[in-house]
């Protein structure tokens, strides 16, 4: 299997760091999974942007009379959850769609369920936890209306992330179960080491692409090789 240069994240040249991952939906992900994989990537981006907006909301919270703890925690959540969510749940589902790996599907279900729980907690907004959720935002209207309005923006975004995360988890789980996936298959991959064998992964990727192409071919209309012009035998 040829080594491809890492291209993600696309860092500016002045940063003395190199990309850590290779990511290309068009070449790695079969057509039947590409849309879902991209939507999960967009969900990760939305979650990261929401954490950034939450930092601004906590700054407004601080300016309006709130404590500095929330702002500090919001900054911590931004620099911690953005890379961790990419590594812990997006990369597993990316590799699962790429190689049809039950082990990576299970890793995604485990970590993404945790992501869903965290998103719900963030949307609720317990004061002192560094998130502008519903409780924190609504309760701050009595202190500073302007700051509370700003805090509502990340609150709505956290709610959207939680809802979209639930929908995504349900959709991927339905697909996985419908395709015959199970915990026993994931355990078998773990026992045999197939989940980290590059040759096995390449074979699985080729099989996934072949299955996708076969499904597309079956959906195409069939035409006869011999033209039929419909001439009548009667003169």
Curated annotation (Swiss-Prot):
Kindly list the places in or outside the cell where this protein is found, as annotated in its UniProt entry.
Cell membrane; Golgi apparatus membrane; Golgi apparatus, trans-Golgi network membrane; Recycling endosome membrane
Topology class, membrane: Multi-pass membrane protein
What is any one GO biological process for this UniProt entry? positive regulation of cytokine production
Cellular component GO terms held in the UniProt record: Golgi membrane; plasma membrane; recycling endosome membrane; synaptic vesicle membrane; trans-Golgi network membrane
Q: Which InterPro entries match?
A: SCAMP
Alphabetical keyword list = Cell membrane, Cytoplasmic vesicle, Endosome, Exocytosis, Golgi apparatus, Membrane, Protein transport, Synapse, Transmembrane, Transmembrane helix, Transport
Instruction: Give the stretches traversing the membrane.
Output: 40-60, 68-88, 103-125, 149-169
Pfam families given for it?
A: SCAMP
Q: Which residues lie on this side of the membrane: Cytoplasmic?
A: 1-39, 89-102, 170-235
Tell me which parts of the chain lie in the Extracellular compartment.
Answer: 61-67, 126-148
Q: Say which family it is in.
A: Belongs to the SCAMP family. SCAMP5 subfamily.
The free-text function statement in the UniProt record for this protein reads: Required for the calcium-dependent exocytosis of signal sequence-containing cytokines. Probably acts in cooperation with the SNARE machinery.
The protein's name in its UniProt record: Secretory carrier-associated membrane protein 5B
Q: Which gene name belongs to this protein? A: scamp5-b
């Amino acid at each position: 299997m040829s080594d491809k240069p890492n291209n993600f994240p696309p860092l500016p040249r002045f940063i003395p760091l190199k990309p850590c991952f290779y990511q290309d939906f068009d070449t790695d992900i079969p057509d039947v999974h590409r849309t879902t994989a991209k939507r999960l990537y967009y969900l990760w981006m939305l979650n990261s942007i929401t954490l950034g907006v939450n930092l601004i909301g906590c700054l407004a919270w601080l300016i309006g009379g709130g404590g500095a703890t929330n702002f500090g925690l919001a900054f911590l959540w931004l620099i911690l959850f953005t890379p961790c969510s990419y590594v812990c749940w997006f990369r597993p589902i990316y590799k699962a769609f790429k190689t049809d790996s039950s082990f990576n599907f299970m890793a995604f279900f485990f970590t993404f369920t945790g992501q869903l729980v965290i998103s719900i907690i963030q949307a609720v907004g317990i004061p002192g936890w560094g998130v502008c959720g519903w409780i924190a935002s609504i309760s701050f209207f009595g202190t500073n209306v302007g700051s509370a309005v700003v805090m509502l923006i990340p609150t709505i975004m956290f709610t959207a992330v939680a809802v979209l995360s639930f929908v995504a988890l349900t959709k991927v789980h339905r697909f996985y179960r419908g395709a015959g996936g199970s915990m026993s298959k994931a355990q078998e991959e773990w026992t045999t080491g197939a989940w980290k064998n590059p040759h096995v992964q390449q074979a699985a990727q080729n099989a996934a692409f072949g299955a996708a192409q076969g499904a597309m071919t079956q959906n195409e209309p069939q035409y006869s090789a011999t033209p039929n012009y419909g001439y009548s035998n009667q003169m």
